[in-house]
Each structure stands twice: as structure tokens, then as C-alpha cells.
UniProtKB/Swiss-Prot annotation:
This is Geranylgeranyl pyrophosphate synthase. It comes from Eremothecium gossypii (strain ATCC 10895 / CBS 109.51 / FGSC 9923 / NRRL Y-1056) (Yeast). Belongs to the FPP/GGPP synthase family. It is an enzyme of class 2 (transferase). The lineage of its organism: Eukaryota, Fungi, Dikarya, Ascomycota, Saccharomycotina. InterPro entries: Isoprenoid_synthase_dom_sf, Polyprenyl_synt, Polyprenyl_synt_CS. It catalyses: isopentenyl diphosphate + dimethylallyl diphosphate = (2E)-geranyl diphosphate + diphosphate; isopentenyl diphosphate + (2E)-geranyl diphosphate = (2E,6E)-farnesyl diphosphate + diphosphate; isopentenyl diphosphate + (2E,6E)-farnesyl diphosphate = (2E,6E,10E)-geranylgeranyl diphosphate + diphosphate. Mg(2+) 2 binds at D74, D78. GO terms for molecular function: (2E,6E)-farnesyl diphosphate synthase activity; dimethylallyltranstransferase activity; geranylgeranyl diphosphate synthase activity; metal ion binding. It is found in: Cytoplasm.
Amino acid sequence: MDSVEGLALGPVIWTASQEELLRQPYNHLVTQPGKNFRNTLIRVFNGFYGLSERQVAAVTELVEMLHVASLLIDDIEDNSAWRRGVAAAHVVYGSPMTINTANYMYFVSMSLLGQLAAQRPAGPLQDLLKVFNEEMMNLHRGQGLDIYWRDTFTVPSEHDYLRMVMHKTGGLFRLTVRIMEALREGPDGPGSTLVPLSNLLGVLYQVRDDYLNLTDSRMSENKGFADDITEGKFSYPIIHGLQYARVHDPAGYDFLVSVLRQRTTDITTKRRVVRYLADVSGSLAYTKQRIIELATLIKTKYIPASGTELCNVIDSLTSF
């Protein structure tokens, strides 16, 4: 009993080796090279905000931590076997451990807000926490809708899908911009926010990701060919294909519905779906055109005059 009382009266002890054990699923993924798109974007955004290198490094660490943790959860929710060319973390470490680690890393990232706030005389911790909570809620709202539609086989409209994406994918982009805006020195000035741009960027990024999932060989190597079909996901081109087939091709509609319900891993069947979206419904061409239109809209209306480097980043999203 003395030893128990000693534990109760002393500080809570957590060792470095225990921390390493807990982070194993996270480290499994974070050590695999990703696209680094968000890191590049933060550096480009900082051309408008003028944060210190120390602040930029902290924002980058926080956003990367949230992104990787969300991927751990995503892969469980989507039953994905692969991520970044290796077995998904839950395949290696199990779902319970991976879920716990991902949730833990959300809180670790939140603890970084205190370090960021301390780097400004005003110490805007309350503002940073508000941004963090709002955008994490938005992210989970979007993800929840995406899962609900998939699991109840509720085909969303294109408009509803884009609204969902603005929550799910736009959340981390908005969080990045809003945190950087809270940290910048001096008055904001009229029209100085990049939040509308980050909203559109989230949509552009997700629609492009949906397109590449069905067409890009590099994505096939990292996640498996047309992984969205195996997940039964209502991605942007698949929604368009279903809407087309429902009106113009009942047999094609039945085929698409059947394959999505099967959650098939059969490559031949998935290639038939992709061919249908390419040659019959025109969904891939439609999606590609929408990507180009979104990029043009962002560049012409939402990027400040001095944003040449940001324009280059947007252009990189339209090169297939």
C-alpha cells in the first residue's frame, strides 16, 4: 500500500520508451515520404503573413501531425490496406492501438498551440484554441457525412458533396490559414484573409485526388488501383457517373451500384468501372474540366496580386 500511496502523491510518470511505444502506428506512417503539399503551402502562405521561421516550423509541425493522425483514422474507417506504398498502420498494429495513437496525436498537436501563443507578446492562446476546435469539428463533420453516405448507400448531389469536402478536406487548409492569421503582427486590413481561398483549395485538392485515384499509376502503387471503388466511396467522378447512368443508362447504373456495394478488390471489375466513367458517362473528362475551372477561379479571383508563387502551386494541381 505504501507504494500505491507513493504513486498517488508523486508526479504522473511517463517515460520516453513508453512514448515511443505509443507512437509506433504514427511513426510507421510519418516516416514514409508523403506529398509534402501542405508544408509547401505553409511556406508560400507565409509570404503574405510574415511569420518567423520558428513560428512557421511550429505551424508546419502541428498541421503535419494532424494530417498524419487523420490518415490513421481514415484508413481504418475506409478499410484501406495500404498507405504511401506500405501496409496501413492498423494492418500492422491493429485498429485499437492505431485509433488510440491517432487520438493521442490530436491532443499532442493541440498542446503545440501553447508554444505558438508564447511566441507573441499578446499570447493569443484562446484564439488559437477556438480555431483548432472549430476546424477539427468541421473535419469530423465532413468525414462523418462521407461515411454515412457510403454506408447507407445515399448518393449525394454534386453540391452536397462539395459542401462536405469543404468541411472534410478544407478543414486543415482553413486551420492553417486561420492560425497563421492569428499569429501575424499588425492590423489585418480589409480583404486580407485567405480563408475563402483555403475553402476553394480544399475542394480543388479533393476533386483532384478523386480523379487521380482512378487514373494515376503512382497513386495505384501507393494505395492500390482505384482504391475508392474498393471502399465503395462516392467520389466526385463516381457521383457524376451514377447521376448520368440513372437518367441515361439503367443497366449501367445497376452495374455501378453492384460494384460499389461489393467493395471489390478485383482489378478487372474496377477497370470496367473506370472505362465506363471514361468512355460512357464522360465523368473523368467532366471531373478534369472542373479541376481546371476551380484552379482558374482561384487564380483569377482569390490570389492577391503578389501571389505568383501561390499561382505556381495551384498550377501544379492541374498537371496530370
